[in-house]
Amino acid sequence: MAELTLSINFTQPIIHRELIRILSPAYQLMPGDTLNLTIALSNSMVHSDSLLIVASAINHLRSNGIEVLITIHGQSTYASRINFYSLIGVPFQENYIRRNNAGRFIELKSFDRDTLYPLQDELNMILYQNGGINKEVLQLLFYCLGEIMDNIIVHSGLDGGWVSAQYYPNRQEIRLTICDNGNGIHHSLTTHPESKYKQASEAEALDLCIQRGVTNGEGLGFGLFATSQFILKNDGDLLIYSGNHYLLATHGNYEIHEGDFYKGTLVSLRINTDVPVDYKDIMPAHHTLPDDYDFFIDKYFGEDNELW
């Protein structure tokens, strides 16, 4: 049986692509193999989406019969508060009072068909309650969040995925990451019997997935198109990582690069909460997005009362 040793240092800034580079060799392990993983933490801010990438990978490996032995150096009350320790099976004594998330974040969570829509509602309610986020941003995020999470249920070949969200009011930004360890975009796009894109390469599949109307035969092929257009017009950042390639959209443009292997699909967004985007620049004519969002708000909060 093989044994692999890896180390992640969260006491220094680390981007998602670097995390994937570190974790990539673990996806080659076989049932019965062992991963010795050392994680360095501190109470300086670590992003929840970075912790999500690690927690989801650990759970994936364990579910496939790989023994994951974890050593933690240092500690992070923030990591504990968003349930990182419990998700990776490491005991942690919480010497603090767990306060409400104050509409700033959700704990790291997995979701499946049964919890998909309640979790979407929870995320949208948290963002609405802050009151400091542009309404046009909230409307498009409401749509894109549902589409991305639904894509995982439909296309990953698994029962569900993982999500993290954090709002930074001082920076006027939201960081949102949704991921799974399933089939990946290339497999989904090229192997479905009704797909028109069976000859696409992995890099081409990433490019195709953000084009309007591209689908493997399931769905309308609009969710990632709308998401990418939203981020480009919002001047935010978008990372879509699947297999050995990733798409990076930033500063109004996007590029596709070859990278280290990631098992499944990762969609990570950084959204500027003060940069409005007109839904009519993205959505089909006569789309009911504003009405759909207002209906959602009325459902949970009663009349909007012109808070906006």
Language-model segments: which ranges?
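Glycine-rich G1-box
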Residues: 183
